[in-house]
Structures are given as structure tokens and as C-alpha cells.
From Swiss-Prot:
<comment type="similarity">
    <text>Belongs to the ATPase alpha/beta chains family.</text>
</comment>
<keyword id="KW-0375">Hydrogen ion transport</keyword>
<protein>
    <recommendedName>
        <fullName>V-type proton ATPase subunit B 1</fullName>
    </recommendedName>
</protein>
<dbReference type="Pfam" id="PF22919">
    <property type="entry name" value="ATP-synt_VA_C"/>
</dbReference>
<dbReference type="GO" id="GO:0007035">
    <property type="term" value="P:vacuolar acidification"/>
</dbReference>
<dbReference type="Pfam" id="PF00006">
    <property type="entry name" value="ATP-synt_ab"/>
</dbReference>
<dbReference type="GO" id="GO:0005524">
    <property type="term" value="F:ATP binding"/>
</dbReference>
<keyword id="KW-0813">Transport</keyword>
<dbReference type="GO" id="GO:0046034">
    <property type="term" value="P:ATP metabolic process"/>
</dbReference>
<dbReference type="InterPro" id="IPR005723">
    <property type="entry name" value="ATPase_V1-cplx_bsu"/>
</dbReference>
<dbReference type="Pfam" id="PF02874">
    <property type="entry name" value="ATP-synt_ab_N"/>
</dbReference>
<comment type="subunit">
    <text>V-ATPase is a heteromultimeric enzyme composed of a peripheral catalytic V1 complex (main components: subunits A, B, C, D, E, and F) attached to an integral membrane V0 proton pore complex (main component: the proteolipid protein).</text>
</comment>
<dbReference type="GO" id="GO:0033180">
    <property type="term" value="C:proton-transporting V-type ATPase, V1 domain"/>
</dbReference>
<comment type="function">
    <text>Non-catalytic subunit of the peripheral V1 complex of vacuolar ATPase. V-ATPase is responsible for acidifying a variety of intracellular compartments in eukaryotic cells.</text>
</comment>
<dbReference type="InterPro" id="IPR000194">
    <property type="entry name" value="ATPase_F1/V1/A1_a/bsu_nucl-bd"/>
</dbReference>
<dbReference type="InterPro" id="IPR022879">
    <property type="entry name" value="V-ATPase_su_B/beta"/>
</dbReference>
<dbReference type="InterPro" id="IPR004100">
    <property type="entry name" value="ATPase_F1/V1/A1_a/bsu_N"/>
</dbReference>
Length: 488
């Protein structure tokens, strides 16, 4: 027992600095407690060598005098207080980044698992990211086209936005995420006509996909889907499986976002980051908190979970003078379909809206089962309109929302009073409700609609009503779009 000084000494600035200790005093879940440690630093990386010669990595979570609490990324099984030695490196956790990471698959710790060659890093970056001066942030604008009508028309996503998918167990959030990855692209304006087309610079768009706590079937689904549709070359995949160490889920989204920041701000790419499942991340956070015997907050989650989630979500955005952007779509499953659960509740406070996946629509065989009424994109106004999508976009979206909400009310009233008691106007709203769910919401998994097709489809439904009932659309827009053929 005791400590043995490493021959490399304590020379500042080198990776081999630090001391080797054999002073493990306890193990609690994913944590190792060390005694008699000289000068440990918060978030310092340690190398742990077990008695059988295997090595693991850990990170200092807490320092109290000569005591240090270390979270071990690969799990604590096999660690004892007799043969285990711990070396402090003096470095924070950094990940190698390179443009060559596109098209590759990594585990939750950032190590390649696709049998490809090692990554030749162009830089090593701190996984906590660099702090961004708020005054240097650029307001998110310009739309990312997902090819899904309910998102593009009614919940448009701006480049640099963070907007989560609120889902639940058994709902097709993985299929929707894969469809967004397949179809997502940039849009640009043609100077002469003012129209928008899909951006031809496909090499300027990239996707970073991080899966946390997923089962092998889900991991294989995403790998197979990316490879079969040819989008793998612009995707970087990080996979933390359900049987991987829970603690690894704490660093997986941070490694993914560090990679995204390099691709966006150093390589000039517009990066879409998809994180699934943030509920697994929150559970890992709760497990670490319980092991540290912290005072629990709501439902056992730590009181600092809001702050911790913000350190992930707030890494989306755009920076003045940098060409690229980071757009985040975190996916989380609400336990028992409860939107008041701490994870979706706190996520909703931080992010700029949400896309709500509805079980009732799913039970009626509607795909994608996106319920537009509780869904919201707070930055939609800056991503649409003349010069960005089309001048009628905002008006059409508002009118669709209004008519769908009224249609839902009429449907509820019909269940009470019967169809005979409804007015002719009420019947129009019922017809709209049915066609909206069958034609606009319903869409094939491989059915891509650009924003013009989606808007024209919306107009075909709005023409069910006489112009006088379309109160949300100004007369000038009516004159231009109401009477024209849907095909134009």
C-alpha cells in the first residue's frame, strides 16, 4: 500500500506527469475513492491498472483535501485495494478529431469499432468544449429541410437550433431519426427567381449521431440504414450499447459534440447532431449521483441535472465569422408517456421547442405519428418566409394549426352530440381533420417532400374551405396561392 512516485516525475505540461498511487479505499458503483493523494485536480484523467495488467480510464469527480473520487468509464469490476494502481495524468479528457471521422463508427468512448484504420488526429480537443462568447453567437436562421411535412411546414428547424423529439417506449422515434438523417439537407436561395432549392453542396452537410444505452438491434438498425442508403460517408456514429458501462454514457454526447464542433467551426460544415436516448443519459447521471450519496432531487435525479443538460444542449449554434453551424435534435423517451418527468421537463426549458411523437396517432397506424398541436419550434420565424422558403409559409402554418385545433374540438363535440347536430361549417373542419392526418401527417419512411411540395399539399387541403373562413391568411397571399393549381 501507500504511494510510489512515478519515474516520470511531476513535470508540468507532459502527459506522463503525476504520481502512481495504490491507495484505493473504496469502490461504490462506478466510483473509486482514493486516499492520501497529492494535488489531484477536478476533471483530471487517471489511468487505472488492475492486478491482471488491464488498464482503464477514469476522471476525477470530486476533490476533498487528500481524498479524490474517480468515476471509471469502463466500470469498476475487478478493482481492489491491494493490487490496483492509479496514475494521475494531469490532463483533462480530450478526444482526437479529424475530418476522416466522417463515415466511421466509434464506441461511446470514441474508439473505432468498424475494423477500419486508426484515426490520424488533426487535433486533440477537450470534450467539455470551449466556452463561446455570447456576443459572438449568430442568431439561428435558414432552414434545415428534413423532408417531413409536419416538421418542415409547421415546426421548421433553423440552422443552429436545438429542438428535441419527445417520444416514449414503443414509438418509432428511431425510424424518424433515421429518416431525418437520410433526408436532411440544406436549402439555398436562387438569386434570380428567389426560389429555394436543395443545396447542391452535399459535402458541406454532415451528421454526428450519438446513441446512448441502445440495444444491439437498434445499433444494427442505424448502421444498416446509413450504409444501405449511401449516407454513411457524411455520418459519424458513436454507439454506447445497453451492455456497455453506464458511466460511459456521461461522456458519449460530449465526445460527439466535440467532434461536431471541430467539423462545424474548423471545417466549415453544417452539422446535424442527433442524440438518442437522453433519458438513458439522465439515468446514468442519477446513478453517479446516487453513488456519490448526493441529496436527490425530483424522482431521485440530481439537483444539478438542469445545469448538466444545459452543458450539452447549449453547444448548438452558430458563431460570428465561422461558416459552419451545429443543429441539435436530441431524442428522449418519456417514462410512462409523462411529459412532466424531470428529463423532458428540464429539456423543454433549455431547448427551443419540441417535436411531440404521439401514441394515439401511432396506434391508428399513422407514420410519422407527430402531433403538431403540442409541438413547437421557437426559432421557426427566423428560418422561413420570403427569401428563405416561401412568402406564404408562415400564414399557411398558422392556418393549418388553427384549422386542425378546431377540427379536434369538433371531433370531440361530435362524440357528445352526434354528427346530425353539427353545422355544415363543422363538417368542413371534420373533413379537413381527416385529410390532414391522412395526407399531410402520413408519409412513407422513404417519402421525401421538399418544402414546396409540402406547402402545395397544404394548400390543396385549405381549399376545402371558402376564403372567408381562412382568417389567418392575408388577402394578398390568397390572391397568389388560393386559386392556383396545386401542381404549380
Amino acid at each position: 500500500m501507500g504511494m510510489a512516485e512515478n519515474t516520470n516525475g511531476m513535470e508540468e505540461g507532459t502527459l506522463e506527469i503525476g504520481m502512481e498511487y495504490r491507495t484505493v479505499s473504496g469502490v461504490a458503483g462506478p466510483l473509486v475513492i482514493l486516499d492520501k493523494v497529492k494535488g489531484p485536480k477536478y476533471q483530471e484523467i487517471v489511468n487505472i491498472r488492475l492486478g491482471d495488467g488491464t488498464t482503464r480510464r477514469g476522471q476525477v469527480l470530486e476533490v476533498d483535501g487528500e481524498k479524490a473520487v474517480v468515476q471509471v468509464f469502463e466500470g469498476t469490476s475487478g478493482i481492489d485495494n491491494k493490487y490496483t494502481t492509479v496514475q494521475f495524468t494531469g490532463e483533462v479528457l480530450k478526444t482526437p478529431v479529424s475530418l476522416d471521422m466522417l463515415g466511421r463508427i466509434f464506441n461511446g468512448s470514441g474508439k473505432p469499432i468498424d475494423n477500419g484504420p486508426p484515426i490520424l488526429p488533426e487535433a486533440y480537443l477537450d470534450i467539455s468544449g470551449s466556452s463561446i462568447n455570447p456576443s459572438e453567437r449568430t442568431y439561428p436562421e435558414e432552414m434545415i429541410q428534413t423532408g417531413i411535412s409536419t416538421i418542415d411546414v409547421m415546426n421548421s428547424i433553423a440552422r443552429g437550433q436545438k429542438i428535441p423529439l419527445f417520444s416514449a417506449a414503443g414509438l418509432p422515434h428511431n425510424e424518424i431519426a433515421a429518416q431525418i438523417c437520410r433526408q436532411a439537407g440544406l436549402v439555398k436561395r436562387l438569386e434570380k427567381t428567389g426560389d429555394l432549392l436543395e443545396d447542391g453542396e452535399e459535402d458541406n452537410f454532415a451528421i454526428v449521431f450519438a446513441a446512448m444505452g441502445v440495444n444491439m438491434e437498434t445499433a444494427q438498425f442505424f448502421k444498416r440504414d446509413f450504409e444501405e442508403n449511401g449516407s454513411m460517408e457524411r455520418v459519424t456514429l458513436f454507439l454506447n450499447l445497453a451492455n456497455d458501462p453506464t458511466i460511459e454514457r456521461i461522456i458519449t454526447p460530449r465526445i460527439a459534440l466535440t467532434t461536431a464542433e471541430y467539423l462545424a467551426y474548423e471545417c466549415g460544415k453544417h452539422v446535424l447532431v442527433i442524440l438518442t436516448d437522453m433519458s438513458s443519459y439522465a439515468d446514468a447521471l442519477r446513478e453517479v449521483s446516487a453513488a456519490r450519496e448526493e441529496v436527490p432531487g425530483r424522482r431521485g435525479y440530481p439537483g444539478y441535472m438542469y445545469t448538466d443538460l444545459a452543458t450539452i444542449y447549449e453547444r448548438a449554434g452558430r458563431i460570428e465569422g465561422r461558416k459552419g453551424s451545429i443543429t441539435q435534435i436530441p431524442i428522449l423517451t418519456m417514462p410512462n408517456d409523462d411529459i412532466t418527468h424531470p428529463t423532458p421537463d428540464l429539456t423543454g426549458y433549455i431547448t427551443e421547442g419540441q417535436i411531440y411523437i404521439d401514441r394515439q396517432l401511432h396506434n391508428r397506424q399513422i407514420y410519422p405519428p407527430i402531433n403538431v398541436l403540442p409541438s413547437l419550434s421557437r426559432l421557426m420565424k427566423s428560418a422561413i418566409g420570403e427569401g428563405m422558403t416561401r412568402r406564404d409559409h408562415a400564414d399557411v402554418s398558422n392556418q393549418l394549426y388553427a384549422n386542425y385545433a378546431i377540427g379536434k374540438d369538433v371531433q370531440a363535440m361530435k362524440a357528445v352530440v352526434g354528427e346530425e347536430a353539427l353545422s355544415s361549417e363543422d363538417l368542413l373542419y371534420l373533413e379537413f381533420l381527416d385529410k390532414f392526418e391522412r395526407k399531410v401527417v402520413t408519409q412513407g419512411a422513404y417519402d421525401t417532400r421538399n418544402i414546396f411540395q409540402s406547402l402545395d399539399l397544404a394548400w390543396t387541403l385549405l381549399r376545402i374551405f371558402p376564403r372567408e373562413l381562412l382568417h389567418r391568411i392575408p388577402a394578398k397571399t390568397h390572391d397568389q396561392y388560393y386559386s392556383r393549381d396545386a401542381g404549380n
